[in-house]
Amino acid sequence: MATALALALPVSAFWLTGCGKGASGDASHETNGTAKLVVVTTTTHVTDMVESVAGKRVEVIALMGPGVDPHLYKPSAKDVTALSKATLVFYSGLMLEGRMAEVFSKASLKGTKTYAVTKNVPEEKLLHPEEFAGHPDPHVWFDPEIWMNCIEVVRAGLTEADPAGKDEYARNAEALKVEYGAVTNWAKT
């Protein structure tokens, strides 16, 4: 027992000191002397897209994990703190994260760039079911051909915030479009 305790204390101290914010107290991390952008995302599908386009140039903080219903999600105090420290926020849009609209608006007013990734989806591609009370169906990621329109919003937002990463973001965005195109072609066969 004493040996296990003697081993547990230094291991715990190691893990505790290795977690959390940097000495400056902000949420950014440095790589090769350059601070990474802090990007907050909402849903897992938006997180996956942002991580694919951004590569290792940014730190992505996902607010919602797998199985979370974005329609009902209420941001916690931790989420609001993450949003306040973010350089960029990417969310799905089309009222998918309906309860977070006010939080996005406040973040935007404080200078954080916020992007609804669905803003480039052509209106004629959106479904308008009767039960959605005049709003489009926000579940556009189920169609990779439609969801592909969102990649450009992510690439443009990242490039605006980090012009030095322009080429990498463009390469990664094109590679992701090829992947989505392959899925679309597979689904049509």
Regions found by a protein language model. Name each.
Residues 15-189:
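Extracytoplasmic metal-acquisition and chelation regions
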